[in-house]
Amino acid sequence: MGWQEVDGSDSNSMGGKRMRPTLAMLAADAVGGDLERATPIAVALEYVHNFSLIHDDLEDLDRVRHHRPTVWAIWGESAAIVSGNAMLKIADAAAWKLRSVGVEESVALEAESELTNHYLKMMEGQYLDISFETEASVTVDQYLDMIERKTGALIEASIYLGGLVAPRSGPDRSKAKALKSMGYE
């Protein structure tokens, strides 16, 4: 399950913006939190994002992403499905490590639940995106609803969860919620 080139050699690619984990860490810093406490959720968010890209490439039959062949284009559809699914479970396992960096049990459970709710919302957006392919037209409101779910859900989760788990004295929900809403203001 490592990163490999077409010839099977290890990849040293540093591609991608890592926007979601960066937002989580920035939110953690914004609330005066401990960045180590936010690291497991930041890692989880990146794995969820990669899961979504692997499946999106297959669903859209995109053979190239960022000038590189996609997983399914190299290894086949079945391998892409399994790889994407594995990424999602690795994301869950990363989130479970919140406790090992000192996040309280109740906060860790809340963060894991929020992560799941947000990636399910992201999947709803992907479903809408796929369904639009057979529509003669899509309204602006329909598109905005789709993109809010498909892309916005994980961005919202990144900002919210980074702010939620990082404070050493426990979560400041008012600050975390303020961060969560900033993309909507």
Predicted regions mapped to residue ranges:
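Mg2+-dependent prenyl diphosphate-binding active-site environment of isoprenoid biosynthetic enzymes
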Residues: 1-185
